[in-house]
Amino acid sequence: MAYSKLRRNTSQRKSLLRSLVSDLIIKEKIITTESKAKELQKKVEKVITLAKKKSLHHRRQVFKKLFDENINKEQTVTQKLFTTTAEKYMKRNGGYTRIIKTVPRRGDAAPMAIITFV
């Protein structure tokens, strides 16, 4: 399967994508570069598909793919994913996110995009 290296070594790329997946689940909308948004979309689609299955095995698989940080005092990222986000897309078979291209970033003219849940 082809993927973008994002000009980082393996550990940095995995950490970046885990962080972006967690942030997208928390905030439900992220502004980032186009290439990061495309890679993030692949990861988020897989994580939500795993979360919809709701077994212990799939929960452990999800823990590997994101940082489980606290959103507030009552809820963590995985709790929000398994309760709110997975329930929202239970009848949908993929296509949980959308990428909207925006104006290039000022300074280096990098192509920017907004990634959000549908």
From Swiss-Prot:
One of its GO terms (molecular function) is structural constituent of ribosome. The lineage of its organism: Bacteria, Bacillati, Mycoplasmatota, Mollicutes, Acholeplasmatales. This is Large ribosomal subunit protein bL17. GO terms for biological process: translation. PROSITE patterns: RIBOSOMAL_L17. The gene is rplQ. GO terms for cellular component: cytosolic large ribosomal subunit. Part of the 50S ribosomal subunit. Contacts protein L32. It holds the Pfam family Ribosomal_L17. Keywords: Ribonucleoprotein, Ribosomal protein. Belongs to the bacterial ribosomal protein bL17 family. InterPro entries: Ribosomal_bL17 (IPR000456), Ribosomal_bL17_CS (IPR047859), Ribosomal_bL17_sf (IPR036373).
